[in-house]
Design a protein with these regions (language model features):
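Thiamine diphosphate
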Residues: 1-14, 66-69
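Core alpha/beta catalytic barrel or barrel-like domain that forms the active/cofactor pocket
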Residues: 8-18, 41-42, 51
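Active-site-proximal loop->helix
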Residues: 15-27, 47
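Conserved thiamine diphosphate
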Residues: 28-74
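ATP/pyrophosphate-binding catalytic subdomain of soluble kinases
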Residues: 54-110
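Flexible, low-complexity linker and terminal segments
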Residues: 91-222
Length: 222
């Protein structure tokens, strides 16, 4: 279906006065978890990718230019688009994504995805992500490592393995990716249904509702 889903993730139930939510960090103390949340936080992007959403992206509420780009891409995409937006909650969870928004830290804690380009981050763009077996690892460029050794982003890959791997990269072990994780073209469900309807009409005619009601096995009740 051609729908856009935007998840504003502030790690809390803000509108209902501060209960812990499915994305609250482990141990988060709230009105409904006074001794700390005991559920591991849900990874929204991993779920969207696992459900085969054809467009999956992440941005940050205060990065207006980047957020606008992501929303524009989602609006132009034909099919289901899922966007996670890191959002602060000033009242009940202030500073939820501080590491991703502060100028002093965000170059080390975020990795901006660009299609066809290597995964590079850092204040001086001196760090990158490469695969070690089946797992990603952080490496420093220039110490026996070149850009050619790094993992290159491919948002068009039909197989969602790369997008899923990227969605699992979280602080403090990895920079957290932002941007478009996946953008693939597939036939839309509603378009395919309409094709079947049109084909049936062409083969059998438009049909009459009264005839449909009276056809096949029927019963009189009462």
């Amino acid at each position: 279906l051609d729908v856009n889903i935007v998840l504003f993730n502030n790690q809390i139930y803000g509108l209902t006065k501060g209960q812990y939510s499915p994305t609250s960090p482990l141990g988060k103390r709230t009105k409904t978890s006074p001794m700390g949340a005991i559920d591991n936080p849900l990874n929204a992007l991993s779920i969207a990718i696992g459900c085969e959403a054809t467009f999956v992206a992440r941005s940050i509420d205060v990065n207006i230019k980047h957020l606008g780009m992501v929303l524009q891409r989602a609006a132009e995409h034909e099919g289901t688009a899922f966007i996670e937006v890191y959002q602060n909650c000033n009242i009940f969870n202030d500073g939820a994504w501080k590491y991703a928004t502060e100028r002093e830290t965000k170059t080390e804690t975020l990795l901006e995805l660009e299609h066809g380009k290597p995964l590079i981050f850092g204040k001086n763009r001196e760090k990158g992500i490469r695969l070690n077996g089946m797992n990603p690892e952080v490496v420093e460029l220039g110490k026996g490592v070149t850009e050619d050794d790094l993992l290159f982003h491919d948002e068009k890959a039909d197989e969602p393995s790369l997008a899923y791997l990227l969605s699992r990269m979280r602080q403090p072990d990895f920079p957290e990716p932002i941007g478009v994780f996946r953008a693939v073209d597939r036939p839309r469900y509603d378009d395919e249904v309409q094709k079947q309807i049109d084909q049936a009409k062409e083969t059998l005619g438009a049909g009459e509702l009264d005839q449909l009601f009276a056809s096949g096995d029927t019963w009189l009740v009462g």
